[in-house]
Amino acid sequence: MCDEEVAALVVDNGSGMCKAGFAGDDAPRAVFPSIVGRPRHQGVMVGMGQKDSYVGDEAQSKRGILTLKYPIEHGIVTNWDDMEKIWHHTFYNELRVAPEEHPVLLTEAPLNPKANREKMTQIMFETFNTPAMYVAIQAVLSLYASGRTTGIVLDSGDGVSHTVPIYEGYALPHAILRLDLAGRDLTDYLMKILTERGYSFTTTAEREIVRDIKEKLCYVALDFEQEMATAASSSSLEKSYELPDGQVITIGNERFRCPEALFQPSFLGMEANGIHETTYNSIMKCDVDIRKDLYANTVLSGGTTMYPGIADRMQKEITRLAPSTMKIKIIAPPERKYSVWIGGSILASLSTFQQMWISKQEYDESGPSIVHRKCF
């Protein structure tokens, strides 16, 4: 690692999108869907030199003839063959680098099973022959990106949400809470409530259209009941959206009913607590002496925290739950969609981090379990 010229690669594998690029950059070079698609029917497209699988944007653009699979479910890798395809695509097609020439920083979900970290480590060294690698917890990287080492991160992506209290740079595992409610569930819920309005969206391809509607038009209401009343009495909240075939649909209270499920999971038929209660419960699992620091440094991260109005609503809900004298601050950086990646870029380019890498030599001596000793 003495040769300073070699940039480390930073790869943040999310359930919905993969973010990849070079350490020291301020944004990922490549952002593409974590999707592997396989043809539904053999040889429909004659002379297309049909491949047996497509990854990312190419899978997305050919989605009409493919069956789409997400190898990462709820933040955890469940299909390693497809995951390998995604990494291969990341290195060779997106970043156009030789992985055997660069250290690689990967990210993992909080509470990721030990066997999974070992498998990631094994694939990096044995399949891609990387000279060095490291596995970092996503939420911790988001906190670094906000310039902090202590705080609680609400990280909500496409497949899973976590509340992760972090003290002096270390995640506190006993207080981490996971909520299996995230972007994909909200997309499904929006499909359902749009169907109630008379618009039908059913296929995996149509789900992507609904995801786009969600990202462009949804917002979080500060007061849900009041917003519902406003929507019922006037058309001021209605917006129109043009579908790919040119048909225009109108959406009203669905705009805020969809993300309201984050605060009221009962909308989805789930018995779980909302993101505000989960954050509060996570703080309450921590030592009484550090709670003040967590309340004052509540950091939002991930694509599902991108809804307009979400920070104000969190502030209101947590103020309600916390002791009345407590200072509560919700930090919602504008780049929070990519803050895990940005934190990884910062970490991998620190001079003090260079001795933290797991080297190929250490891996050869100790095997995959080295990851538990060096990454925490």
Swiss-Prot record:
Reactions catalysed, as given in the entry: ATP + H2O = ADP + phosphate + H(+)
Record's subcellular location: Cytoplasm, Cytoskeleton
Swiss-Prot/TrEMBL keywords: Acetylation, ATP-binding, Cytoplasm, Cytoskeleton, Hydrolase, Methylation, Nucleotide-binding, Oxidation
Listed GO MF terms: ATP binding; hydrolase activity
Primary residence: cytoplasm
Record's comment on post-translational modification: Oxidation of Met-45 and Met-48 by MICALs (MICAL1, MICAL2 or MICAL3) to form methionine sulfoxide promotes actin filament depolymerization. MICAL1 and MICAL2 produce the (R)-S-oxide form. The (R)-S-oxide form is reverted by MSRB1 and MSRB2, which promotes actin repolymerization.
Family affiliation: Belongs to the actin family.
Function: Actins are highly conserved proteins that are involved in various types of cell motility and are ubiquitously expressed in all eukaryotic cells.
Protein name: Actin, cytoplasmic A3
Organism: Bombyx mori
